[in-house]
Each structure stands twice: as C-alpha cells, then as structure tokens.
C-alpha cells in the first residue's frame, strides 16, 4: 500500500514537473520571404509584370480615395516616372470604408514594391480615375443614362461599388497566370499576391452583400442589381462566357445549385474563375478589344504583353 502511495506521489510530481518545464520539439519554419530575383525563371517575367498595370490602378484608386493623394506622395519611386492619374480625388468615406480603403491602399503599395523588386517594373501607365469614366462604365452596365451620373467619390457605398470593379480583375488574372509559371520565387510571389487580392475582393463583396437590398441613392436600383449589371458588363466585354457574378445569383449559379447568395464568385466546383491578359484588357479598356485602349487606360497598359496587343 505504501508502495502504491509513493508511486502515485512520484507520478504526480513528474506530471507537475512536466507542466512547469514543458519539452518542445525543434520547430520547422518556412524561411523568411526575401522576394529577390533568385528562383525567377526568365519566362515568368513578362507574365508577372503584366499585373503591375492592375496594381497601379488599385494603388492609385485606393490611395486617392482614402488619402487624397497617390503614389507620387506615398512612394514616388514606384511610379518610375510614369504620368500621374487624372480625375482621381478624395472620396467622401464613412469611418468603416475609410479604414478598409486605407488598408487596401497601403497593401497595394507593398504589392508594387514586391513585384518591381522581384521581376522588375515599368513606368506607371496613364490612368483615368475620373468620376466620368466610372459613370460611363455604370451607364454601359445599365444600358441607359443615369441622372445624375454615377459618382464613385460621392459616399462610402458608391465607392465600394466602384471598388467592386477593381481587385477582382487582378484576382482572376493571377489565377490564370498561375499554371504557366516555372520559377519557385515567382510562384511564391503570385500566391502571396493572390491571397491578399482575394481577401480584398471578399471584403468588398461581403460589404455589398450585407447591403444587397439597399437602394443606391439617388437611383432606383439596389446594390445587388449594381453588382449583377457590372458583372454582366465585364462578361460581355471579355467575351469568354460567365466568369463574373454579382452578390446575388440564380440558384443554378449558386454553390452546388443550392444558394442564391454569392458572397464569393466561383465556378461550378466553387473554384475561382481565371482570365487571360487579353480578356482582362478587353474589360479594363472598356472597349471589348485588347488592341483598342480606353476606359481606365487611355493610352493602354505598359509592359511587353500589353504593348504587344497595341502593335
């Protein structure tokens, strides 16, 4: 009996000692990211430079909307001497959208820095961020002249509706580029960029989904209608089927044909859609033709892929 009592005391002390002095295994950690040029396959460079066009668009739109100034103030070296955007202005944001867009803005600065450091860059293309350009886009989506013209800088909701048209193009572009990359460093960079772009798109879509039934003043259309019309327009311009969906969809387009909610846009298997550079240019040029600049890029995009279409 005494033996059992002593044994119990010994086990208790051993357990207590283990709790006080836990024994950890040696952790295995991923190396810190350096995003240098090691592991960059030469064949990847053009493909990974192309999205710099979209990152410039996002950075300038978000910086101006949140802060009232752009890269020329925040990180002028990243613009590489390219012309400043025209028509951009500080948006009339509420505290929630101000915080969201400010974070997005600084994230895009980091994206540009990582891309330029890893695969090189090019001068910022001329960007049209004017209210009239967004008004033209929304009118094309609805098929008639809105009175007054849509102004993305009017308030937080209008700005988030305009933002609905921005990160998603980068997202589907990165998904499309992914299978073609060879270098481990460019693959790592793309994965990291895609993760944040997807997160931005999800935040925007969730914000709009929560307000799906709200009528967008001063128009008679709801938030859900705006997202559906913008997505339909982008599908028409890209001319490659349905790869873009609003926050409310017919049940046959919902997840497993079971939902009408569509917080995340995805295909039949709930996998992200993908687009080619040509599709993306047809959309962001607002012309339906990758060889005819317009829309956000009056003079076209920069980099070998975008310029090749203009020859």
From Swiss-Prot:
Its EC number is 1.11.1.6. Residues 1-25 form the signal peptide. One of its GO terms (biological process) is hydrogen peroxide catabolic process. The keyword Ligase does not apply. Pfam families: Ferritin_2. Involved in the production of blood-red nectar containing the alkaloid nesocodin and that serves as a visual attractant for pollinator visitation, including vertebrates such as Phelsuma geckos. The nectar is initially acidic and pale yellow, but slowly becomes alkaline before turning into red within 24 hours. Together with NEC1 and NEC3, facilitates the condensation of sinapaldehyde ((E)-3,5-dimethoxy-4-hydroxycinnamaldehyde) and proline to form nesocodin, a pigment with a stable imine bond. This is Ferritin-like catalase Nec2. It comes from Nesocodon mauritianus (Blue Mauritius bellflower).
């Amino acid at each position: 009996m005494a033996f059992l009592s002593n044994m119990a005391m010994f086990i208790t002390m051993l357990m207590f000692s283990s709790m006080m002095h836990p024994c950890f295994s040696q952790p295995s950690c991923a190396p810190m990211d350096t995003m240098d040029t090691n592991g960059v396959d030469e064949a990847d460079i053009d493909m990974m430079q192309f999205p710099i066009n979209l990152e410039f668009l996002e950075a300038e739109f978000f910086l101006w909307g949140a802060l009232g100034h752009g890269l020329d103030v925040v990180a002028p070296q990243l613009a590489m001497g390219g012309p400043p955007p025209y028509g951009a202005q500080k948006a009339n944001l509420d505290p929630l959208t101000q915080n969201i867009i400010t974070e997005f803005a600084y994230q895009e600065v980091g994206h540009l820095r990582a891309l330029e450091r890893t695969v090189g860059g090019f001068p910022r293309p001329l960007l049209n961020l004017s209210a009239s350009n967004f008004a033209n886009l929304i009118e094309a989506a609805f098929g008639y002249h809105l009175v007054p013209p849509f102004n993305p800088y009017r308030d937080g909701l209008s700005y988030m509706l305009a933002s609905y048209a921005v990160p998603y193009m980068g997202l589907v572009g990165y998904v499309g580029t992914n299978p073609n990359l060879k270098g481990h460093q460019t693959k790592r960079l793309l994965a990291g960029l895609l993760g944040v772009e997807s997160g931005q798109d999800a935040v925007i879509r969730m914000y709009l989904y929560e307000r799906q039934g709200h009528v967008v003043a001063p128009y008679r259309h709801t938030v859900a209608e705006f997202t559906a019309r913008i997505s339909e327009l982008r599908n028409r311009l890209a001319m490659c089927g349905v790869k873009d969906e609003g926050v409310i969809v017919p049940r046959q387009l919902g997840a497993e044909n079971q939902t009408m909610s569509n917080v995340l846009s995805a295909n039949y298997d709930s996998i992200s859609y993908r687009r080619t550079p040509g599709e993306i240019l047809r959309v962001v040029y607002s012309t339906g033709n990758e060889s005819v600049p317009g829309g956000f890029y009056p003079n076209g995009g920069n980099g070998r892929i975008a310029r090749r279409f203009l020859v």
